[in-house]
Amino acid sequence: MTRPTLILFLRVPAIGRGKTRLAKDIGKVEAWRLSRAMTAGVLGRVRDPRWRLVVRVTPDGALAGAEPQGRGDLGQRLQRAIRANATGPVAVIGTDAPDLDRAHIARAFDSARRHGAAIGPAADGGFWILALSAARARSVGFEGVRWSTAHACADTVTALGGEVARLETLIDIDDQAALTAWRARARGRRGPGAGPGRPAERPGG
């Protein structure tokens, strides 16, 4: 059996670039710090011998050893990356879901094997993972998807066609409301001692 491929879509953190909605709420420097923490956290959590990790970055060439995302909108870049790795099952993730771990990824691959496709909805209407069988990955397309809106997950399901299993909903941190919601959940899980600057307050931690 061909080992699955996990593709991490990554925007290399830089002050004033990316996380624009969050930066408007908490400032560019703090948004950059959070972005760095989330990126480091995901990179530390998702490596696993059960799958091959491919990192695709923007801007192109911004991270040594990573592959460029290239030109086009998000759908075009995702399509290229997925089809290029469709020798076996493929899943794609980003860095915005701080609760994402190896168990989530393993369940997504398992669902894709059974149903052909699986998607993990984000609380804001986007998605935190898309997993596809090799056959579905080879023909994947994202026509009509309204990216960076509350319709992105539903539009992606429509664009995929066929059966798509739905996984659990996770929080994607794109603005202050999502950050506040995530911190409240993290404090609830880790207890009342988790205050500012402690692990419950650090998405990558």
Model-identified regions with their sequence ranges:
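Conserved donor-nucleotide/metal-binding helix-loop-beta segment in metal-dependent transferases, i.e.
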Residues: 100-126
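Short phosphate-binding loop-to-helix
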Residues: 62-90, 149
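Conserved alpha/beta core of the MobA/IspD/sugar-nucleotide pyrophosphorylase nucleotidyltransferase superfamily
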Residues: 154-205
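Short, glycine-/small-residue-rich phosphate/pyrophosphate-handling segment
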Residues: 131, 135-157
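Active-site acidic Asp-centered loop
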Residues: 93-95
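Short, polar loop motifs at secondary-structure junctions
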Residues: 55-61
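N-terminal nucleotide-binding beta1-loop-alpha1 segment
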Residues: 1-22
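A short, N-terminal amphipathic alpha-helix
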Residues: 33-51
